[in-house]
From Swiss-Prot:
Keywords: Ribonucleoprotein, Ribosomal protein, RNA-binding, rRNA-binding
Domain of life: Bacteria
Subunit structure: Part of the 50S ribosomal subunit.
Family statement: Belongs to the universal ribosomal protein uL22 family.
GO molecular function, one term: rRNA binding
Any one annotated GO CC term: cytosolic large ribosomal subunit
Classification via PANTHER family: CHLOROPLAST 50S RIBOSOMAL PROTEIN L22-RELATED, LARGE RIBOSOMAL SUBUNIT PROTEIN UL22M
Gene: rplV
HAMAP family tied to this protein: Ribosomal_uL22_B (MF_01331_B)
Stated role: This protein binds specifically to 23S rRNA; its binding is stimulated by other ribosomal proteins, e.g. L4, L17, and L20. It is important during the early stages of 50S assembly. It makes multiple contacts with different domains of the 23S rRNA in the assembled 50S subunit and ribosome. The globular domain of the protein is located near the polypeptide exit tunnel on the outside of the subunit, while an extended beta-hairpin is found that lines the wall of the exit tunnel in the center of the 70S ribosome.
Keyword rRNA-binding: yes
SUPFAM superfamilies: Ribosomal protein L22
GO BP of this protein: translation
Protein name, per record: Large ribosomal subunit protein uL22
Amino acid sequence: MADEVKAVARFIRMSPFKVRRILDQIRGRSYQDALIILQFMPHAATEPIKKVLESAAANAEHNFSLDRRALVVSTAFADGGPVLKRFRAGDRGRARPVRKRTSHITVAVRSTSEVE
């Protein structure tokens, strides 16, 4: 059986710095606790993270017949993706660069029986 079951969301149009703030809050928590935390946080980054977490739990349930209630978030991280470079009008007719960052979000879960 797999040690960890993971799910990845790539090219999410959000800064990795903002996503990591949320991931730090759910790392090491149970699946149920992580969902509750994400549900009540007032940040936009919680939506894609919640989708990835639910996908990882579905992978564990479907592929390895693990119980969702017995899952723990073992790994959660966000890497930087490609940066979209845009320009905004600046002073004196100049153009100022704007870097629209993207993220790759990875969440891995494991069964609590494996953690102990």
